[in-house]
Amino acid sequence: MAEVELQGSGPSLQKRLMLICVSVFVGIAIFMLPTPAGLSETGHMYLALLAALLIMFLTEPVPLPIVMVISGISLIVFGIGETRAVWAGYAHPVVFFVLGCLMVAIVAESVGLTDRLGRFILRYTGTNVIRFSFISCLGLGVSSAFMHDIAACAIGIMAMLPLMKAAGINVGSRTGAFLMISLPFCCSAGGMGTLVGGGRNMVSAAFLQDLTGIEITFLDWMIYAFPACLVAVPAVWFACFLVFRPDRTICFIDLTEEQKAKKPFTVDELKALAVVALVFVGFFTKNLHGQDYSIIVMGGIVLMVLIGLVDWRILNAKTEWAVAVLVFGGGIALGTAMGTSGAAEYLASVFFPFFEGKGWLALLIGVGVFAAIMTNLMANIAAAALILPIAIPLAIMEGVDPTIVAMAMGMWTSFAYLLVIGCPPNVVSYSFGYFKSSQLTKAGLVAMPVGMAVLILCALTWWKIIGLV
């Protein structure tokens, strides 16, 4: 049974112009307010622009890639950022990392690996869409702790898409949005489980060591965070389920006897698995060779094309360049400008005094909430560079173990669920067009507090048991 498609081709021209006018009016109104003490004129201009852009993010009067082009142009025209610095964000290493992971997933699909994965999951879940979603989100979410959240998300989506299309789950449908939002959310939540699950974890550990000399090893981080990961992944999935209430009558098409039969891997599948394994080895040994993740994954793509696993023209045609470069790159440029304009530092100076002198739990929640909100707008490296130099000395001054602050930075930023640009898995899933950015925000407003509640519960129970607090 197919669901009725809920979204059309987009708002009418009249509605688009009205939404743009509302966005511009809000931005002008905020800019006309007196500049608060401690905030520069440039920072004030940035916050006014950000307010206008947030309305466009949520209403999409024009496609989101175009909104992010408007963002870059505005940063330059209004003097918030220099031309080269702004456009450099659109070519950030993380952009190429996102592109590379998308391409790896496309290659995995073309050689049949994602189809094999989808059939493997169906054997154990049956055709029920809800059960399939829960098992795949749980498996890929927990796997994200070891294989990087964006890679797990991209491979999972490519395995799920053919099943969704065959079942008649349309773009814009409630069930389609549920499937395509719950997976990146769960992969992001799972990424907190170990140091290699996401760059945010390693950045937080590195800042802690630089500022205090305290080292968090791979095993330390796993002991602190992996139990929370095991609880957060299903909790976030359930939050998405409550928001979208997917149609329980929809089922995937059952496997034929031939499809159920286990077949040996083809030569191309084995070649692809070998290259993917090399890429993951590169991820795990990054501290030894020092190469960026983008270099590792793009090197894998070069190797895949070189050995004939995929035709470049097919790879070029299937890759969502605009979403990766314009949406995620634009988000990085916008986040960088938040730091250089002084707006981020001002917001931190307003926010953190509320949590001073109130103990480790208040500091944990304060750092975590602020970090989770900020990482929706700026890269986690930039957020860590802003927050940890303020929060770690504050923790030491109050007699709180600074490790708690670093863990909060890495773990709470796993819930960047409010905007598409918040984290790479969101961008990857959005690129397939199954949901609007406003739908992701709607789900994030529920899933984000649920994930945070899990982390607070973990701190009050597990961290006390192991003696971290």
Feature locations, PLM:
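Membrane-core helix-loop-helix motifs of multi-pass transport proteins
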Residues: Q7, P11-S12, A167-P246, N426-A459
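Re-entrant/interfacial helical elements at transmembrane boundaries that shape
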Residues: G72, I150-M164, M180-I181, G193-L211, ...
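Alpha-helical transmembrane segments
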Residues: P93-M103, A145-A152, C187, W221-W237, ...
